[in-house]
């Protein structure tokens, strides 16, 4: 009876198992509506439709487009801010895949739109979820993704062509310096337009990342839809010869059973199983003692 009870309790506590990996798109659609950093001489995105209709009785679509490298969801090559470092076509493919680490600073960013991620945020993550793994792709969830459809909200400014008016979160250079020195990461990313916070004029985070061969990811979408640990990130970085960056299709995959919301459940299951095991041993020993006592009588 005790074993049946144990099985029933564990079955109730176990999370549902679908047997399927979840796939989350971390990419905003590339379009003329996407935010891009205003740099003189850089055109805005344009899609020119050459044919969208029947051609010789066959439906046929073909277009050409012009795009900035650093607009919408995109990657920064190390060469973007560091002379002589990898350009887009030189990035090793193994650097485009890695375990995700999501640093949640939504509450901090809500209070301070110029919030910069600090080493204490990394410390807090490691206390709760363990050491940042080798080759990690570190992503910041500041809640800024909810603003993406409105450029004024993304840059947090009424003057979207004037970077001096921008206010949005990013990394602090001291935190990045510690991360690059003490943890062997592959990429760092944000759900905002820049790795540096909006009021930066020196772009020290970009410089540090470039000098250390770290790829940057900006305007990453749906970070709030992946677990803080346990996901794998795949970055489809456009391989433009001599490019300083470019559009990226970023995908996350993960097993729901290792995501944060399931971990507590599994801890409860393990503890419950141990307790039932101890209870079973206790009952068995108690019965053996009673049987032994009867034989003695």
Predicted ranges, named:
Residues 2-270, 275-297:
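Active-/binding-site microenvironments in catalytic and ligand-binding cores
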């Amino acid at each position: 009876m005790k074993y049946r009870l144990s099985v029933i309790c564990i079955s109730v506590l176990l999370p549902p198992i679908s047997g399927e990996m979840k796939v989350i798109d971390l990419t905003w659609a590339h379009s003329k509506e996407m935010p891009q950093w205003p740099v003189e001489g850089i055109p805005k995105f344009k899609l020119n439709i050459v044919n969208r209709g029947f051609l010789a009785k066959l439906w046929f679509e073909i277009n050409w487009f012009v795009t900035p490298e650093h607009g919408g969801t995109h990657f920064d090559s190390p060469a973007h801010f560091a002379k002589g470092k990898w350009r887009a076509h030189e990035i090793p493919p193994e650097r485009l895949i890695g375990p995700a680490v999501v640093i949640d600073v939504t509450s901090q960013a809500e209070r301070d739109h110029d919030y910069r991620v600090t080493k204490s945020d990394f410390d807090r993550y490691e206390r709760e979820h363990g050491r940042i793994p080798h080759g990690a792709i570190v992503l910041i969830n500041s809640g800024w993704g909810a603003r993406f459809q409105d450029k004024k909200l993304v840059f947090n400014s009424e003057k979207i062509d004037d970077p001096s008016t921008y206010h949005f979160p990013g990394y602090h250079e001291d935190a990045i310096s510690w991360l690059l020195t003490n943890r062997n990461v592959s990429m760092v990313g944000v759900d905002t337009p820049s790795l540096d916070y909006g009021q930066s004029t020196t772009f020290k985070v970009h410089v540090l990342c470039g000098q250390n061969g770290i790829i940057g990811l900006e305007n990453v979408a749906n970070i709030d839809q992946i677990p803080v640990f346990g996901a794998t990130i795949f970055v489809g970085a456009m391989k433009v010869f001599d490019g300083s960056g470019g559009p990226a299709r970023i995908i996350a995959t993960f097993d729901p059973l290792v995501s944060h919301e399931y971990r507590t459940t599994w801890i409860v299951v393990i503890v419950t199983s141990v307790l039932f095991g101890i209870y079973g041993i206790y009952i068995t020993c108690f019965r053996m003692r009673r049987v032994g006592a009867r034989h003695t009588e």
